[in-house]
């Protein structure tokens, strides 16, 4: 698997990813995307990420959408979810943006308890309504909760108590 913002993804990359059976995580924060995800010139990157998703769809690359749940995303989850559905994204992962454990300061973009609760309850209601109507969209967190509920093991390490080694290349090359 590989994680990307998709900005440099083109047909050549898509063919490579498909041929080598990569699962791609594409960072996309929907309608809130351009608030925090800027390019080197300070411009929002939402249009480019959507372009990357279309390229991957065209070439049959398997990909998931990874959304960072900021306070803005949480408060606008209905619009965010509808945007994801409209774009026919079928595999969604939501990653909560929490304050650092060693910092008492709250940042404007991090989630408070009330925002996160609203996000989870609202998203579950929207997802469940679609599920009951025969329109299944995979939301990793809910898929893992279901697995635990039926006595299976969650595949998400934060829910299973055991994580595999993951290699990361930071933005500065480390």
Kindly label every feature range from the protein language model:
Residues 35, 63, 102, 151-152:
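Generic signal for short, ordered secondary-structure residues
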Residues 96-99, 146:
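Residue-level detector of flexible, active-site-proximal loop/helix-junction positions
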């Amino acid at each position: 698997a590989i994680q990307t913002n998709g900005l440099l993804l083109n047909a050549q990359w898509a063919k490579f990813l498909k041929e080598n059976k990569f699962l791609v995580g594409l960072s996309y924060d929907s309608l809130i995307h351009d608030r925090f995800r800027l390019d080197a010139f300070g411009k929002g990157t939402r249009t480019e990420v959507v372009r990357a998703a279309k390229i991957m769809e065209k070439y049959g690359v398997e990909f998931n959408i990874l959304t960072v749940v900021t306070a803005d995303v949480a408060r606008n989850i209905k619009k965010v979810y509808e945007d994801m559905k409209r774009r026919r994204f079928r595999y969604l992962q939501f990653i909560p943006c929490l304050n650092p454990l060693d910092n008492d300061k709250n940042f404007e973009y991090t989630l408070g308890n009330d925002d996160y609760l609203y996000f989870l309850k609202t998203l579950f209601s929207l997802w469940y309504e679609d599920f009951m109507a025969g329109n299944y969209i995979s939301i990793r967190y809910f898929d893992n909760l279901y697995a635990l509920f039926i006595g299976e093991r969650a595949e998400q390490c934060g829910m299973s108590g055991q994580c595999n080694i993951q290699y990361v290349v930071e933005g500065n090359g480390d």
